[in-house]
């Protein structure tokens, strides 16, 4: 995701310094017109720094620093903005916003809906929140990354909550797509025809159309790998527990994802919920996409 996004920014004429943790990535990034580095200090002179990282801990390390490594808060100039596009907890977002504020810096949360292919095609949907002046400063960049930006408030944590709940709608839909496809297949019918029927009538949205067809085709090649999906589910359940809101459907999805990973499917997409559903039903399965 991050590489595709950085490439699009560079193609739009923005000078991009790409900080990576793995030196072997530098050749690829250089070929894309980026200025790659493994030293976070090289971005300290930037007006806006974008982070696209896997989890709370990774974003905290970059923003707050660790051990002898200076983070963005200590390194960026007052007035600079940290544009955090990772899917993280609301607690982490609030902590980071407060830390940047102490240094006179802005913090905008802008997680995205969309897979790596959508990132390449600039078809992401961005969910942004932060101080209005900071969001507007970031908008020219966001416009090059996605097809639409939804501003959901001034508290960065609100963007992360919206993103997590959106992912839970997708995750529970994947579970039901997997279960219904397993039944259709076990009864000797074509799940693809079922998905076409449903998406042509009552369920015409992107999730049912795109992921439904992938589950029907038993296509589990990773776009959003199961461990990252499980991370988001756990974050969502943490938010639910904090608010005393039961989310039993999401709890089921968490357990199914854990089952998939325990069966050796950690490298597969979260569409592999369909594979687990088929196996649980003793329905015919194709393992061509499994390790």
Question: Across the structure, where does each feature detected by a protein language model lie?
Answer:
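Helical "substrate-binding/catalytic lid" subdomain
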Residues: 156-280
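NAD(P)+-binding Rossmann beta1-loop-alpha1 motif at the extreme N-terminus of oxidoreductases
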Residues: 1-52, 80, 116
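Hydrophobic beta-strand scaffold residues
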Residues: 16, 36, 106-108, 149, ...
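Rossmann-fold NAD(P) dinucleotide-binding segment
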Residues: 40-106
């Amino acid at each position: 995701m991050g590489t595709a996004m950085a490439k699009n920014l560079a193609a739009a004429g923005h000078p991009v310094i790409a900080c990576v943790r793995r030196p072997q990535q530098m050749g690829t990034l250089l070929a894309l017109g980026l200025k790659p580095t493994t030293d976070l200090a090289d971005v300290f002179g930037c007006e806006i720094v974008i982070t696209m990282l896997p989890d709370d801990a990774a974003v905290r390390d970059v923003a707050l620093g660790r051990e002898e490594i200076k983070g963005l808060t200590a390194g960026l100039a007052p007035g600079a903005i940290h544009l955090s596009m990772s899917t993280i907890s609301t607690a982490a977002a609030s902590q980071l916003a407060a830390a940047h504020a102490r240094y006179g810096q802005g913090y905008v949360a802008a997680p995205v809906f969309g897979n790596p292919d959508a990132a390449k095609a600039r078809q992401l949907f961005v969910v942004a929140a932060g101080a209005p002046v900071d969001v507007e400063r970031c908008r020219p960049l966001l416009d090059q990354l996605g097809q639409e930006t939804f501003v959901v408030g001034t508290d960065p944590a609100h963007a992360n909550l919206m993103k997590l709940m959106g992912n839970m709608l997708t995750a529970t839909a994947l579970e039901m797509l997997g279960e219904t496809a397993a039944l259709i297949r076990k009864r000797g019918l074509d799940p693809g025809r079922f998905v076409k029927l449903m998406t042509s009538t009552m369920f015409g949205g992107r999730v049912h159309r795109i992921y439904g067809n992938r589950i029907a085709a038993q296509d589990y090649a990773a776009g959003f790998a199961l461990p990252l999906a499980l991370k988001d589910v756990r974050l969502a359940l943490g938010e639910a527990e904090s608010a005393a809101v039961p989310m039993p459907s999401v709890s089921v999805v968490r357990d199914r994802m854990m089952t998939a990973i325990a069966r050796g499917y950690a490298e597969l997409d979260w569409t592999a919920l369909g594979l687990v559903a088929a196996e649980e039903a003793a329905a015919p399965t194709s393992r061509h996409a499994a390790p």
